[in-house]
UniProtKB/Swiss-Prot annotation:
Alphabetical list of InterPro entries matching this protein: Sortilin_C, Sortilin_N, VPS10, VPS10-sortilin, WD40/YVTN_repeat-like_dom_sf
Main subcellular location: Golgi
Transmembrane segments: 1315-1335, 1365-1385
Coiled-coil residue windows: none
Source organism (scientific name): Verticillium alfalfae (strain VaMs.102 / ATCC MYA-4576 / FGSC 10136) (Verticillium wilt of alfalfa)
Region annotation (Disordered) ranges: 1426-1447
Gene name, Swiss-Prot/TrEMBL: VPS10
Residue spans of the BNR repeats: 65-74, 108-119, 386-396, 447-458, 491-500, 723-733, 820-829, 1103-1113
Membrane topology classification: Multi-pass membrane protein
Name used for this protein in its record: Vacuolar protein sorting/targeting protein 10
Length: 1447
């Protein structure tokens, strides 16, 4: 190939365009100009391609206007009612079709460029959540997918419909979607088969239970998801080689590729999967050299080529971002780095644009002073412009003469369409300046190039908006201005060498907004849009058609480039055609391959090599294969191969050098690695595990730890040394050595991030798993407690509640101030003063709330007077303009799942009243069942509400050491309650023996009180429910103990006289030590005894179940602490130690077959006290950490590594020799429970309580304002957890009636489908489903009970203040026991509690006060003492009482 351009690759593009050499006289003196005036801005202006027909959208009036003469005259489109246009969509593959989308089901379409419009029904309402409403088929314009929503219920469910005949008929495609696309969504993409190209559809499907994006999956159907024999015809593609992936959040079509992005809990790192046929997918691999990751909101898929994908990944602070640009190989899988320090803005736009019509050329802006910007986030960027002619292999400066030119690009968009170029061959324009770097836009001039950017010249002074016409023979520009002072347009007929001006008619002066023309830039007609004074908007039609008489002929044509035009082609809507010619390959046609970097003209290995499929399967590290030489042909390069050896010929490589290289053979041994923490005087540790997500590319197991000790008064001392390990405790090093760290706060949702506060306003943080550390200045002093609150979706959004002091009337007054940052602390804005706490309550999952919603508890006035009541305020715009007081006289609030629970004063009852809200704006009270009187001195505890209902514990016995209560269960919106379990045990602080089992929906363990013994102690029994608390049973006892000795009693299923009873939540030293683990479905451990009731813990033995509590067996004598590993294939037990009883040992016990056999492993030569055993919270690691103290007082950790036991990965469950067995619960599930004011009678039927009435229609419709209808009460209601469909629906066997005022909607629903009625009536809060996932991300696996109404400090100098549980006046406790996760899809759970207290005395403090205290761990140390923080944890907020205000 011949080289064209500086440093160009070896191909040449010949563009047959125009060349003119003669001069003709203008027919007229200038263009014809016509002005039209409008009251509102003409937005979304669109040409029908290859025509003069233009449409625009008046969004103020919701009307569409049309012009058929390139903007000269305008009128509203015919056949469409006024005020219905929600959006305007142009057909992507048919230049005569467009759609007017309304906010209803009836829309309008045109097939004749808008001349006439026809109504059509989309079979679904327009989605308000999705940008892309219509998805078009690239091969058949009649095939369209409509992404809509079904709002038959209170909340809207996203659905997709489709048509194969241009909406003559629309059919349902799929429900519960997050977007659907045709496989053939690009003209270049093909599945390889014509029938699949025509039919294949891809949908992102929401989980049937979980509303969270981490549970979404990709589904493919070739017959529109139809059912055959009751089965939906769909399949899940093997995104990750041999299995599907959950967490699919987006799909993009890029030329001939489909890209799918997935996410997972614990991290914002995403995985990108690529296919070029929808069948074979690959995970996009980025070079290992610099550790670049694709994070949510931090990557941009650029305009790709026909033969590769280009991606820019942000790698710096979000407030002043820069990126790295990568280009893939030809199948879109392996990316190599093209350019570092690309210029980006906060919206993800990248200063990058390809030159239109010419492959391989693009302009990009980079940051020259990148080191300063990385170090100091507020530094001004010095932006420079570069160009490449070989698709990013080499880059060059652009120059005007000898002066370097820098141009404003995509991050400063000043017009519609492309920034620099158009289909006009070789013509490029831009606004910029000469010099060392890019100046402000207002200081720029207009520059032009007619050789595709190889050379430039200044065209006009000042910044301009510009366009190309007549395939480049005409350039038009209008000066840019912030004022309405522009009264002329400029134009050039010689590629910008000379310019003329034309004045706007009648002395019109305007502020230019856009200038545009046809998409192919072949027209001589342009449209200028501008504004002048007030609400005057002008559409100016410019027609240069009469400017010259001569039309270009064949002898005016030559190979591009062509200049000095004095004729017009006048071939409107005919595009220039590029031709290519291939030459012999040279070094310039090759670049470094994946994980190779260029050095001294060679490509050196900088990371693992990719082996061909099957090359290193079952191979040893020294096995060799033919692999990459380090070079690859530049994607898309079609050079002719010469004879002989090639630069990219495969060479010999070793399997030890490849990605996922073979593991060394298993040794069969467990290894123990000890690390002594020298000079440590304290006796405990704060431990923070940085959990990984499924989409994480890291394989480390990082733990952060520091020594701590709790004083008798509850305060905590900490050592200043903070330690880090990246290999689960084999090696430790000290971090932040010179800093006096005060508090350590893991990010509640994104576990790669941890924040460290100091005694000053300096805050350190890491976002890459403690690899690197950055700092920011907080807006106020940290005060006591956790000052930070995090957003569930936006990693960089922070709320800081700190202490501010100022002089008021000569006296210093201190208060808490809430500040908000949207760029991870680089910039702060004050939200509220005199605030108690604030939380982000907006979330993408809860579509009924604004993503920006914040709820705060603050004082009504800005003072600290005792009579200053507290109020709940909310905002949907960060308190910039929106600030609404929602409730007054509030004591506190707590968030749990989708509920916001508020405790407010009830002055009539002289106590507290509880309210709840779903949307953060409307709060409603709850109704308790008949005969359940609630004293104002009672305590309320909200238990885990993960299964579509609130479990509310109400204390009924208040005597100290005898406290107990009833668990009431709500309907799905938390307003009416029925009895679930009476006489449930709680401690003196109203923490409850209640736990939902992780990994299985609906399985709950409680301890109930059956009386007193002779000493006056409570007699407790353990009960279990397998249908979310509707029915309870005792635990069946094993027949014999671990030694084979029979117990003193026996029972097949467990009964009052003989059952297994377990020590529960209230007796745990560490409130996070749960019975089960996230990744181990059905497996539970506990210690207790066999008999008629629970015995002393000193006499307890250890038991386990592998079937979720159906059967149990004894595994150890005495009480042992357990830890799960490798998804339950490893369980480790250690003797339980307490402060009073230090169990000493030098070995641990473990099983690798679910407790069938147990082995001991000696980890120490002398006996030591094991303070704790920890591992990754989900139970997926094969490493464990023992935290020990020796007899001579040394504190140390021991890593136990079980990876040596085996090197064989488990075989696929579907294979014949599978290592898995299919397990499913066998307990019968009841799908119904008693309704409000109904209870089980002696015949186990739900009967109306004597003297009471069922929930009335008026009450139901009032409490559910969006409900359309109600059923006459039958006595039954569905368990909110159940997902059953059809069958015996006991709540719907009665007659349905419309709510008042909803008669018309009722009739429409009744005529639509039973499914619609189901959603409208049965599930009034829709997406309350499966909030167990919410816990996994919101509250991780923290099982510490959140004490509402208390304040405590996690900092070493902040006392743990103990607050009362019950006051004489009133006490209401709202305690959140955080949710469990479903077996197949759910990963972890939590049982943390939150309590809203009215004040009083007594009670110990478990958590830190002030705002969202997220303590650290899954394992804590002593009763009444604080939990240590693990990254998984979210201890929730302490809902403070009045004494919290002391700051």
């Amino acid at each position: 190939m011949r080289i064209w351009g500086r440093g160009a690759a070896s191909w040449r593009t010949l563009l047959f365009v125009l060349s003119w050499t003669t001069t003709t006289l203008a027919k007229d003196d200038g263009p014809t100009i016509k002005v039209s005036k409008f009251k509102h801005p003409p937005l979304n202006m669109n040409y029908f391609e290859d025509s003069d027909v233009v449409l625009f959208h008046d969004m103020s009036e919701n009307n569409i206007y049309r012009s058929d003469d390139a903007g000269v005259s305008w009128g509203k489109v015919a056949g469409v009612p006024d005020g219905v246009a929600y959006t305007l969509a142009m057909h992507e593959f048919d230049n005569s079709r467009a759609f007017i989308i309304t906010d209803r089901r009836e829309h309008f379409k045109t097939t004749d460029r808008g001349k006439s419009w026809e109504k059509f029904d989309s079979a679904a309402q327009t989605s308000r959540y999705r940008d892309q409403i219509l998805s078009f088929h690239a091969g058949d314009p009649d095939r369209v997918i409509f992404n809509g929503m079904d709002c038959a219920g209170i909340f809207c469910n996203e659905v997709a419909t489709y048509t194969t005949n241009n909406f003559k008929e629309a059919k349902t495609l799929r429900g519960s979607t997050e977007g659907c696309w045709w496989a053939k969504s690009s003209e270049l993409f093909t599945t390889g088969k014509d029938d699949l190209d025509r039919q294949r559809v891809l949908c992102i499907g929401a989980d049937s239970i979980s509303p969270f994006k981490e549970d979404q999956r990709l589904f493919i159907s070739d017959n529109f998801f139809e059912k055959i024999d009751g089965q939906v015809q769909q399949f899940e593609p093997n995104l990750d080689t041999n299995h599907g992936i959950q967490g699919v959040v987006n799909l993009a079509v890029v030329k001939k590729y489909l890209l799918v992005a997935t996410t997972s809990i614990n991290t914002d790192e995403m995985s990108l999967f690529v296919t070029d046929d929808t069948l074979k997918w690959h995970r996009a691999m980025f070079p290992a050299a610099h550790g670049h990751k694709v994070n949510q909101g931090a990557y941009t898929v650029l305009e790709g080529t026909n033969y590769s994908i280009q991606v820019d990944v942000m790698n710096t602070r979000p407030s002043n971002p820069m990126g790295v640009m990568f280009t893939s190989n030809s199948n879109g899988t392996f990316f190599v780095e093209n350019l570092e320090h690309t210029n980006r803005n906060e919206r993800g736009n990248v200063d990058f644009e390809k030159i239109s019509g010419i492959q391989g050329i693009f302009l990009v802006n980079t940051v020259k002073n990148w080191e300063d910007v990385e170090k100091h986030g507020g530094s001004r960027k010095e932006v420079v412009t570069q160009i490449t002619f070989d698709d990013g292999r080499t880059f060059h400066d652009i120059k005007a003469g000898d002066d370097r030119v820098h141009l404003h690009s995509v991050t400063h968009l000043d017009n519609v369409g492309r920034v620099f170029s158009s289909p006009a061959p070789g013509l490029v324009m831009g606004v910029g300046n000469t010099g060392g770097s890019l100046n402000d836009f207002e200081e720029g001039n207009l520059f032009v190039s007619d050789d595709a950017g190889a050379s430039w010249k200044k065209a006009l002074d000042g910044p301009h908006k510009y366009e190309f016409g007549d395939q480049g023979s005409l350039l038009v520009a209008v000066k840019d201005s912030k004022k309405d002072d522009v009264g002329e347009v400029s134009y050039s007929l010689d590629h910008g060498l000379n310019w003329k001006t034309a004045a706007l008619p009648d002395g019109l002066k305007l502020k230019p907004e856009i200038i545009t023309t046809t998409q192919d830039s072949t027209s001589l007609k342009f449209i200028l849009v501008g504004s002048s004074g007030g609400d005057n908007y002008h559409v100016v039609a410019l027609d240069f058609g009469g400017l010259q008489e001569k039309t270009c002929e064949d002898n005016d044509m030559e190979d591009w480039p062509a200049r000095d035009a004095d004729c017009f082609l006048k071939k409107e809507f005919k595009d220039p055609i590029p031709k290519t010619e291939d030459c012999e390959c040279s070094d310039a046609d090759f670049e470094c391959d994946y994980n190779f970097i260029r050095k001294d003209g060679e490509c050196e290995k900088a990371g693992p090599i990719v082996a061909p499929d099957e090359a290193c399967k079952n191979a040893g590290p020294d096995t060799s294969f033919k692999g990459s030489s380090g070079w690859r042909l530049i994607p898309g390069n079609t050079c002719k191969r010469k004879d002989g050896s090639q630069k990219d010929d495969p060479v010999d490589r070793k399997c030890s050098d490849v990605v996922n290289s073979p593991a060394p053979p298993a040794s069969g041994d467990i290894t123990a690695t000890q690390h002594i923490f020298k000079d440590t005087k304290l006796n405990d540790f704060e431990k923070i595990y940085l959990e990984r997500g499924d989409s994480s590319s890291d394989s480390d197991e990082t733990v952060i730890a520091r020594a701590v000790e709790y004083e008798n008064d509850g305060s905590m001392r900490v050592e200043q040394r903070v330690y880090r390990t990246r290999d689960h405790g084999k090696k430790w090093d000290e971090i932040l050595e010179k800093e006096e760290i005060r508090g350590i706060y893991p990010h509640q949702y994104f576990k790669d991030a941890v924040f460290f506060t100091t005694k000053s306003r300096k805050v350190w943080y890491t976002i890459d798993r403690a690899e690197h550390f950055h700092e920011f200045e907080a807006p106020s002093d940290p005060g006591s407690g956790n000052p930070l609150s995090f957003h569930p979706d936006k990693k960089d959004w922070l709320i800081w509640v700190g202490q501010k002091c100022e002089k008021v009337d000569g006296k210093e007054q201190c208060f808490k101030e809430a500040s908000i940052s949207r760029d991870r602390g680089d910039n702060w804005r004050t939200a509220l003063r005199y605030v108690q706490k604030c939380e982000f309550t907006g979330r993408s999952t809860y579509k009924f709330r604004d993503m920006r919603q914040i709820v705060c508890l603050t004082h009504k006035r800005e003072d600290n007077e005792s009579d200053n009541p507290k109020v709940i305020v909310s905002s949907n715009d960060f308190f910039e303009e929106d600030k609404q007081v929602r409730e007054s006289n509030v004591k506190d609030f707590a968030t749990m799942a989708e509920f916001i629970v508020v405790a407010a004063e009830d002055k009539e009852q002289k106590g507290l009243r509880a309210l709840a809200s779903l949307d953060g704006e409307t709060y409603a009270a709850a109704h308790f069942p008949y005969n359940f009187e609630v004293s104002h001195q009672n305590a309320y505890t909200v238990l885990d509400s993960s299964t579509h209902a609130v479990n509310l514990f109400v204390a009924t016995q208040l005597e100290k050491n005898q406290r107990q209560g009833s668990i009431l269960k709500s309907n799905s919106n938390g307003t009416s309650y029925v009895m679930s379990a009476p006489k449930v045990n709680c401690d003196n602080n109203y923490f409850v023996d209640f736990e939902k089992i992780i990994g299985l929906e609906g399985v709950v363990l409680i301890n109930s009180v059956t009386g007193k013994d002779k000493k006056g102690n409570k007699i407790l029994r353990t009960e279990i429910s397998h249908n979310d608390g509707s029915q309870w049973a005792y635990l069946p006892p094993p027949k014999a103990d671990v030694n084979g000795k029979a117990y003193g009693c026996s029972s097949t299923y467990g009964d009052e006289k003989c059952a297994l009873h377990l020590h529960h939540y209230t007796e745990r030293l560490d409130k996070k030590k749960t019975f089960s683990a996230a990744s181990v479905a059905g497996l539970m451990f506990g210690y207790g005894n066999i008999g008629s009731s629970l015995g002393p813990i000193e006499e307890a033995d250890t038991f386990m179940t592998t079937d979720a509590g159906i059967t149990w067996k004894s595994v150890k004598k005495g009480a042992w602490t357990w830890q799960y590993g490798d998804q339950g294939s490893i369980v480790v037990l250690v003797p339980r130690s307490t402060e009073d009883k230090k169990a000493k040992t030098k070995s641990i016990s473990y099983t690798t077959n679910e407790g069938k056999d147990w082995k001991d492993f000696e980890f120490s030569q002398e006996e030591v006290t094991i303070l704790d055993i920890t591992s990754i919270r989900t139970g997926s690691s094969r490493n464990f950490l023992l935290w020990c103290r020796s007899s001579d007082g040394k504190t140390f950790s021991v890593n136990l590594d079980f990876t040596g036991l085996t090197d064989r990965p488990c075989v696929n469950p579907e294979s014949g020799d599978s290592d898995y067995y299919l397990w499913s619960p066998t307990h019968p599930l009841q799908d119904n429970e008693c309704d409000y004011n109904f209870e089980l009678d002696p015949h186990k039927q739900c009967s109306l309580v004597p003297g009471k009435k069922p929930l009335s229609a008026e009450q139901y419709c009032k409490e559910n304002p969006d409900a359309v209808s109600y059923y006459e009460p039958t006595g039954y209601r569905r368990i909110p957890l159940t997902t059953c469909v059809g069958g015996t629906e006991l709540d719907k066997i009665s007659e349905a009636h419309p709510c008042k005022g909803k008669e018309e909607e009722f009739e429409k629903l009744r005529g639509t489908s039973g499914v619609a009625i189901f959603f409208a009536i049965v599930i009034p809060i829709g997406i309350a489903a499966a909030v167990g996932w919410w816990v996994w991300r919101n509250y991780g696996s923290q099982f510490g009970q959140i004490r509402l109404g208390e304040s405590s400090g996690f900092d070493n100098d902040a006392p743990w203040v103990k607050y009362p549980v019950i006051a004489v006046s009133a006490a209401v406790a709202v305690v959140a026991a955080l949710p469990l996760l479903g077996s197949a899809l759910w990963r972890t759970a939590s049982s943390a509690y939150e309590r809203v207290s009215g004040g009083g005395s007594g009670g110990g403090s478990w958590l830190n006060g002030g705002g969202q205290r997220r303590f650290t761990t899954r394992d804590s140390f002593a009763r009444g003492r604080g939990d240590y923080a693990s990254v998984d944890d979210d201890e929730g907020e302490l809902l403070g009482d009045d004494s919290d205000e002391e700051v």
